[in-house]
């Protein structure tokens, strides 16, 4: 599914990753651990196509397609999801509208018809229920005024709705509240 070979990256002429090799097969779970500053978040960002990281050499293949040089949008359309270490707030954009736009965009890219509104609402409610989230949450701005744990729960919510082929969870435990630990 994912093959990384001899990946070397830098930011502003500072080497960050120096020869990373990793192979992930479908259904496998990998935990990448290391001290602060060892490049874990950099690896996640590179896999998601964030442009501030320059790939000096090496390859990243996802489902037999080279993804180095693809935009974050192109990578997400391939089915890679990144849960951020520090999720951003987007006041004024409701979670419901955001997720509808995401799913519509994905369906369009896959040449599939848009999900009917009734199916979308049903899926949103089911996902809320599975995470013990009040459906009022759907009208809130994305991460607007959310606690650290609520932000993480929101990202899990988004991941479940998008059903990616590969999920990269960066620092999933940072900022968690006690309620989030029950998920």
Task: Place the predicted regions along the sequence by residue.
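ABC ATPase NBD Q-loop/coupling interface
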Residues: 59-75, 143
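Short coil-to-beta microelement around the adenine-binding A-loop and adjacent beta1/P-loop entry
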Residues: 14-17, 74, 182
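The feature captures the beta-strand-to-loop junction immediately N-terminal to the Walker
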Residues: 33-35
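Walker B catalytic motif
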Residues: 168-172, 179
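ABC-family P-loop ATPase nucleotide-binding domains
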Residues: 88-165
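Conserved structural motif at the start of ABC-family nucleotide-binding domains
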Residues: 2-4, 17
């Amino acid at each position: 599914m994912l093959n990384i070979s001899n990946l070397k990256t830098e930011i502003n002429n500072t080497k960050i990753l120096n020869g990373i090799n990793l192979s992930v097969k479908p259904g496998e779970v990998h935990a990448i651990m290391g001290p602060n500053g060892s490049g874990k978040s950099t690896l996640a960002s590179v896999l998601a196509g964030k442009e501030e990281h320059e790939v000096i050499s090496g390859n990243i293949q996802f489902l037999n397609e080279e993804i180095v040089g693809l935009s974050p949008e192109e990578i997400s359309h391939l089915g890679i999801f990144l849960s951020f270490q520090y999720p951003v707030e987007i006041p004024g954009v409701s979670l419901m509208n955001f997720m509808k736009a995401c799913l519509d965009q994905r369906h369009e890219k896959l040449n599939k018809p848009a999900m009917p509104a009734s199916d979308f609402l049903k899926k949103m409610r089911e996902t809320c229920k599975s995470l013990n989230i009040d459906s009022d949450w759907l009208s809130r701005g994305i991460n607007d005024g959310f606690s650290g744990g609520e932000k993480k729960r929101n990202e899990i919510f988004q991941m479940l709705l998008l059903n990616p082929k590969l999920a990269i969870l960066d620092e999933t435990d940072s900022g968690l509240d006690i309620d989030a630990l029950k998920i």
